[in-house]
Amino acid sequence: MFITFEGIEGSGKSTALQGLAAWLQQHGHGVAVTREPGGSRLGRTLRSILLDLGNTDITPEAELFLYLADRAQHVAQVVRPALDEGMVVLSDRYADSTVVYQGYGRGLDPMMLRQFNDVAVGGLWPDLTILLDLEPEAGLNRALARNIREGMHAAEGRFEAESLAFHTRVREGYLTWAALHGGRYRVVDATQSPEDVVRDVVGIVAAALGDVSSGEAVSGRTGA
C-alpha cells in the first residue's frame, strides 16, 4: 500500500507520518518511510537546490522540472522496489505537491502538471493521501520556528520565505485538489494536538488496510 502525506508548510506531516509508521510496525507491517524532495541519492542533491533560501531566482518552470527529476528517480529507486517487496510505503509529499505548489501556487496549469507527473511516476499514484489542513499563518509560524530551532532556516527555508498570499493559494489549492480526487484523499484537522492528529491518521489507515485485506485496494494506483 502506498500512502502519501500532503499539506502546507508546518502542517505536521513528518510528525504524523512517524506516528503512523510506529503504529504500522507495532502491528507487524513492513514499512518504508521516504520523502520528497530527497528520497534518493540524486534527490538529496536536488533538495539542496530546491529548498535553499539563496535560490529565490529559480523560475516556476525550472522548479517544476527539478521536482519532476527528483520524483522520477525516487519512484524508480525507492517507491516501486518497496511496493514490490510488499511494504507499506509512507511518503512525506509526492506528486500532488507539485500540482498544488507549482499549479495553484505559481500559476502553472494544474492539469498539465498532472500529465507531467504521470510521466515522471510511470502512472504510480497513491492508494491513500492524507491532507493535513490548517490556516497558512499558523503553519508558517510552526515551520519558521522549527527551521530556526534546527538551524535549517537558510538551507531549507525557501518556501517559508514566500508571501502569506502564496501559502493561502496553496492551502486553497490543496482543498480544491482533494475535492477533485476524493476517492483517495482524507482531510485531517492539523490544528489538533500531534497525538490527536496521529490518532485520526491511524484510524483512517486502519480502515484502508481492511479494504486492502479484502481485495478492495491495490498497492499503487494507476491514475490519480
UniProtKB/Swiss-Prot annotation:
The keyword Transferase applies. One of its GO terms (biological process) is dTTP biosynthetic process. Keywords: ATP-binding, Kinase, Nucleotide biosynthesis, Nucleotide-binding, Transferase. ATP binds at residues 7-14. The keyword Nucleotide-binding applies. One of its GO terms (molecular function) is ATP binding. This is Thymidylate kinase. It comes from Nitratidesulfovibrio vulgaris (strain DP4) (Desulfovibrio vulgaris).
